[in-house]
Amino acid sequence: MESKFAHIIVFFLLATSFETLMARKEIDGPEVIELLKEFDSNLMCEGKQMWPELIGVPTKLAKEIIEKENPSITNIPILLSGSPITLDYLCDRVRLFDNILGFVVQMPVVT
């Protein structure tokens, strides 16, 4: 019984000695806050970001609709469903995944 109690005490001592990953000290100052704001603003893209209504629509028509609804989208590759993709994020790209019949099978989103 004493062994379990000792383990619990050691666990709590270790847990209280670590800070959480998101914790920020007051001495970090406003510079850290400004950098975080700048980072967040870079992730925001302009215009419409997703088109759930285009699932089942012919791919070429879907491409025209996306170009019309968000002119900042200039890169719209058409890929066969299941194709490998890169994990980078670009505000000017929407990938269209279609099937062998030429219909959109996944929701187009800015990626």
Swiss-Prot record:
Induction (UniProt): By wounding.
Main location: secreted
Propeptide: 24-36
Entries under SUPFAM superfamilies matching the protein: CI-2 family of serine protease inhibitors
Cleavable signal peptide: 1-23
Pfam families xrefs: potato_inhibit
GO molecular function, one term: serine-type endopeptidase inhibitor activity
Site-annotated residues for Reactive bond: L87, D88
GO cellular component: extracellular region
Protein name: Wound-induced proteinase inhibitor 1
Organism classification: Eukaryota, Viridiplantae, Streptophyta, Embryophyta, Tracheophyta
